[in-house]
Amino acid sequence: MEGLTTLIRNGNRRRTLAVVWLAGVALLALLAPALPLPYPAGVPDLAHVAEAPARASHHWLGTDPQGCDVLSGLLFGARTALLLSLPAALLAALLGGLAGGAAGFWGNRLRMSIPGGGLVAIIVARSVGVPVPALAMGAGVLGMLWAGRRMRRLSATIPVPLDSLVMAAASSLDTVPRLVLVLALAARGGLSVAGLGLVLGLTSWSGPARLVRARMLSISHLPFIEAAQASGLSPARVWWHHALPHALRPLQTALPLSLAALLALESTLSFLGVGLPPDVPSWGLQLAAARQQPQAWWAILFPALILSLTILSFNILTAKRTSPAV
């Protein structure tokens, strides 16, 4: 019993330290432009190239082999990591949560009703090879959809294997290693922070989708869901207001892990010189610059230490309190 209490206390201390560390990194990242730094990030000081912290009086953590201030690079690199990994993780959680929740709730039983006008428009668009401007075609389809809905004639219902489609898309995305996929997309041209975040988010939704789908399958037949369905609510309302909020709970654990994975992936891309432009500060770019002069240990130690502690803190937040088996 005493050992279990000690384990829990140690776990609480680790979580507290992780939260304090992440909060400090986030605060410094947000305040980086307003901090009174001696030198801006990415601007070389050619008079002090690869100088150790003890030798460079104005560079508190020294300079890298390019003459850039290590401390400024760390702070603005934290800002880049925050502005990139957090929106990407939230986008992946949003897409995966909606896709996995819908797939788990409806399965392959979803049926979509197409009004008569829409059915006629689809048939005509697929069978007639007359070149029509996209805007005119879109306006025509919308008009026929509206007319068909008003007349309620020639309506058709088609089955939609939603679960199979979502799982096939997730499996196809997981077939290619994420690093290779992002490298292929990012290598087409220089991406901004927002562009790279969008690429990372669109290639990371499969994991959250599987978690939410599994949770949805376990709760879709619980009494409170059946009671909501028996009360006469529409399936979409039951899914949105009753089933989905409970199915999204696994994302509370998955989000820190996703942040850690995206942070490591972004640093890897920057280290390889793919992804962010060279003028955007990044911990990966700092490590890549330190390769030019390996004896400048401070240029390697500080970015690697900050990156490792940040990823470790995210992983600690996901650790659950478990008691040893008796």
What do these predicted ranges mean?
Residues C68, S72-V326:
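Alpha-helical transmembrane segments of integral membrane proteins
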